[in-house]
Amino acid sequence: MAIEGGERTCGVHELICIRKVSPEAVGFLSAVGVFIILMLLLFLYINKKFCFENVGGFPDLGSEYSTRKNSQDKIYNSYMDKDEHGSSSESEDEALGKYHEALSRTHNSRLPLADSRQRNYAWETRQKYSPLSAEYDGYSSEASIDEGNCIQRMRRTPPLDELQPPPYQDDSGSPHLSCTPSEIGDSKCEFSHCSNSPRCSYNKCPSEGSTGHEIESFHNKGYEEDVPSDSTAVLSPEDMSAQGSSSQLPKPFDPEPEAKYGTLDVTFDYDSQEQKLLVTVTAVTDIPTYNRTGGNSWQVHLVLLPIKKQRAKTSIQRGPCPVFTETFKFNHVESEMIGNYAVRFRLYGVHRMKKEKIVGEKIFYLTKLNLQGKMSLPVILEPSYNHSGCDSQMSVSEMSCSESTSSCQSLEHGSVPEILIGLLYNATTGRLSAEVIKGSHFKNLAANRPPNTYVKLTLLNSMGQEMSKCKTSIRRGQPNPVYKETFVFQVALFQLSDVTLILSVYNKRSMKRKEMIGWISLGLNSSGEEELNHWTEMKESKGQQVCRWHALLES
């Protein structure tokens, strides 16, 4: 094909080459090429990174070899440097000979240390699973960096019985049990059957091939003695079990010579003219240990026997020697009948989420009381004994029944229903707290089975209008129920003498209407003299709870 009017002619392929490529195509092809190159570089980088990544959890097996290789190279270079700066007559073979000689000396100096560490690691790993070391775990050892290598060395080590020499025997023929601590800081206890006392050894483990005498240092409470021996005698657990009673192990603890249940520091002050008794509980000492009581909070309960209507309890204090310094008043204690009265003290261990536990108790008879002035004396508590019942005689010892078994009643009321109430008023906050503690001799008049009872509390003003009301939960099938529920009423100080608190005990029946077992009222319109005295004592107690038994009135 020819082009007319031109000086030269060209073929078809030359026409195609003459055409120009568009800049967009050039840019696109360049971008694709750059992208492919970047992806290739990224792939090579990632591949190289993964190849040199350490597998998690496995030690670097070549680190030790590389470190040793570097040290050898340094020694070799140092000798080569000396050879270059020294005389030129020394050949390279002689330098290599010096290098190998120095390397062998370095290896020989490090060999005993490595062997001792290897044996120590094997003994340490085996000792962790020994029953002998489990008995005396008072010594701790730190973990080594080469723990994985220690396990491998232990597998290649022959059993302990094959390594140990025959037991060393002294002049009396008694074998010695010794222990050897490793260089990483752990140590084991040893025992000497001839001295019957444990001794700890702090010496270095001898090598297997040692034939010389080793010096063992025995430390026993500051006393040091050097005893020469042929080798360290180590008894295996099988040898210990075979000896049986011949090996005397130390006791973990010495039992107390005499059990202690607590000692109260108490002060008595009796006023014969007003017929009242003031009892001050100062502190408690000689409290049992935590292992016996299981708690570290304490409370003292007091009750005047035999009537058991006047009760008191201290605040809760913590510590091994709690200090209370609280005074309680008991009224109507006639001087003519003082020989028939007694005060029972009980120390309780208080747990946050558990029931109170009696630690000890003591009944102090007022016949020992000094009727003139104060008398301070310690009251040593004794273990508590629960009595199943009591007679209706006017004997204090027979009326000192357990507080948990409320079947023991007072002489005045016989078997009438009674309720134990605790009152407390805080003048600062204006809060009246009424605690329903327990009931006694609740009866079901319609059936012979025990009743399902609850207590309803109602607070009335001076006009008889209801200010507040609340009730306890139901106690099912209990003639002597224990409630221990506290209710708080907001009463101003100037209104305290004008309010009435009514407590009603009901028997909850399923298909019938509820039945009232009895009731009492305290305050302005008190139901009796005892209830009025209880209210008056509550106002005079200055923030301390006053507990009293009250006989219920029939509806």
From Swiss-Prot:
PANTHER family hit by this protein = SYNAPTOTAGMIN 14, ISOFORM D, SYNAPTOTAGMIN-14-RELATED
Cite the residue spans of the region called Disordered.
157-179, 222-257
In the UniProt record, what gene is named as encoding this protein? SYT14
Domain of life according to the entry: Eukaryota
Q: In which tissues is it expressed?
A: Highly expressed in fetal and adult brain tissue.
Q: Which residues lie on this side of the membrane: Cytoplasmic?
A: 48-555
Primary residence:
membrane
TM region(s), chain numbering: 25-47
Query: What are the subcellular locations of this protein?
Result: Membrane
One Pfam family of this protein, by short name? C2
Q: Name one GO cellular component term.
A: membrane
Which organism does this record belong to?
Homo sapiens (Human)
What GO molecular function annotations does the UniProt record carry, in alphabetical order? phospholipid binding
Q: Which disease is it linked to?
A: Spinocerebellar ataxia, autosomal recessive, 11: A form of spinocerebellar ataxia, a clinically and genetically heterogeneous group of cerebellar disorders. Patients show progressive incoordination of gait and often poor coordination of hands, speech and eye movements, due to degeneration of the cerebellum with variable involvement of the brainstem and spinal cord. SCAR11 is associated with psychomotor retardation.
InterPro entries in UniProt: C2_dom, C2_domain_sf, SYT14/14L/16
Task: List the membrane topology term(s).
Answer: Single-pass type III membrane protein
Q: Which Gene3D superfamilies match?
A: C2 domain (2.60.40.150)
Tell me, in a sentence or two, what this protein's role is: May be involved in the trafficking and exocytosis of secretory vesicles in non-neuronal tissues. Is Ca(2+)-independent.
Location of the C2 domain: 260-379, 415-550
| Name this protein carries in UniProt | Synaptotagmin-14
List the keywords (alphabetical): Disease variant, Membrane, Neurodegeneration, Repeat, Signal-anchor, Transmembrane, Transmembrane helix
Specify the taxonomic lineage: Eukaryota, Metazoa, Chordata, Craniata, Vertebrata
The record's note on quaternary structure and interaction partners says: Homodimer. Can also form heterodimers.
Q: For side Extracellular, which residue ranges?
A: 1-24
Family classification: Belongs to the synaptotagmin family.
